[in-house]
Amino acid sequence: MHDAVTRPTPPADATAWPRRITRAVKIGSVTVGGGHPVVVQSMTNTDTADIAGSVKQVADLWRAGSEMVRLTVNNAESAAAIPRIVDKLRMMGIEVPLIGDFHYNGHQLLAAEPACAEALAKYRINPGNVGFGKKKDLQFGQLIEFAIKYGKPVRIGANWGSLDQSLAAQLMDENSQRDTPWDAGRVLREALIRSAVDSAERAVELGLPRERIILSAKVSGVQELIAVYRDMASRCDFALHLGLTEAGIGSKGIVASAAALSVLLQEGIGDTIRISLTPEPGQSRTQEVVVAQELLQTTGQRAFTPMVTACPGCGRTTSEFFQELAGVVQNHVRAKMPEWKITNPGAENMTLAVMGCVVNGPGESRHANIGISLPGTGEAPSAPVFIDGEKSVTLRGENIAYEFIELIDQYVERTYVRRAG
């Protein structure tokens, strides 16, 4: 692994570093890399052979904002199901690129099910388990031949948990000959990067254009992921897919993903992301999409829905009303965004503030496009509303929530030019 990685000089203003220049990869209707916006993707956890269940979950993920969806293709039944899943989604008006996740037997499944090979928008290949011993190069080559034949891009995704053991052993042997050996973690990171990058170069030798290759090298640790991607980004110009192998459950998974990916994104590294959350019992699979969107929006990479700022509350706030109002506002703009995206483009950039007392309320409200400062303890029972930095109106009574929502809708219609449906 390199002793030093050259990274862009941080900008002097409050912006992220310039995006790393990568090759653009066309995946169905979506373009990854080449300066295009960072793409959100997700993965189903259904049995792919369960066509109805898989269609429903893909549709749910797509409606939540996933721009590509990956499905496990691990046996003949799941491979045969893929074309039917694509057809049913199209009948619903959903044209989302589907990615086939192959391990161990992808070369056999694509050979046996050409309709699957055609229906998928991209193939994911794991160089650590595509084949073993003498079969590795042969089976990897067969997968690349299918990608060439059907004009499909591939993601060559190395994983910490399924690392090419022969490569790892080779690098461990080489490391033992160094005057100052690296620690084991550094050797394994090098093996992970080499597995992905060398496999990509092999695919190019076999005839797959560089513009059809995306790389990933996933681990579960935050610092390890940052180190791996910084190094890998310095070695190639392939588009990169970011994500922890397993982020975890609940807040731990969200925090781990945000800690790792936000650093890389701020440094201009990463062209597509997935937040690999373990859903809690009864929790929707779509949470990983929402978290991915919020991560990209809070780091200034993209805008998906108006941002709502709300204070956390303290002893100065007299009730939970401002918290309830913040929730109502957030739910309202999320529900309206699919319509606004079509009829009022730009509404996703709107900022809103729902504050609970006079200390920061008026100031935060002035910074937002629309903000409301609700009364705190000992304050007059009135709620001034600020629009684009100027006090507009003061709301009172029991209909504050309804009236504030009306002001938001009116602002959208007035500010973001309506397009004919």
Curated annotation (Swiss-Prot):
GO molecular function: 4 iron, 4 sulfur cluster binding; 4-hydroxy-3-methylbut-2-en-1-yl diphosphate synthase activity (ferredoxin); 4-hydroxy-3-methylbut-2-enyl-diphosphate synthase activity (flavodoxin); iron ion binding
Binding site for [4Fe-4S] cluster: C311, C314, C357, E364
Pathway named in the protein's UniProt entry: Isoprenoid biosynthesis; isopentenyl diphosphate biosynthesis via DXP pathway; isopentenyl diphosphate from 1-deoxy-D-xylulose 5-phosphate: step 5/6
Gene Ontology process terms (BP): isopentenyl diphosphate biosynthetic process, methylerythritol 4-phosphate pathway; terpenoid biosynthetic process
Reactions catalysed according to its record: (2E)-4-hydroxy-3-methylbut-2-enyl diphosphate + oxidized [flavodoxin] + H2O + 2 H(+) = 2-C-methyl-D-erythritol 2,4-cyclic diphosphate + reduced [flavodoxin]
Entry note: cofactor: Binds 1 [4Fe-4S] cluster.
Enzyme Commission number(s) of this protein: 1.17.7.3
Organism superkingdom: Bacteria
UniProt keywords, alphabetically: 4Fe-4S, Iron, Iron-sulfur, Isoprene biosynthesis, Metal-binding, Oxidoreductase
Pfam families: GcpE
Cofactor(s) of this protein: [4Fe-4S] cluster
Keyword Heme carried by entry: no
Family membership noted in the UniProt record: Belongs to the IspG family.
Function: Converts 2C-methyl-D-erythritol 2,4-cyclodiphosphate (ME-2,4cPP) into 1-hydroxy-2-methyl-2-(E)-butenyl 4-diphosphate.
Protein name: 4-hydroxy-3-methylbut-2-en-1-yl diphosphate synthase (flavodoxin)
The species this protein was found in: Xanthomonas axonopodis pv. citri (strain 306)
Lineage: Bacteria, Pseudomonadati, Pseudomonadota, Gammaproteobacteria, Lysobacterales
Encoding gene (name): ispG
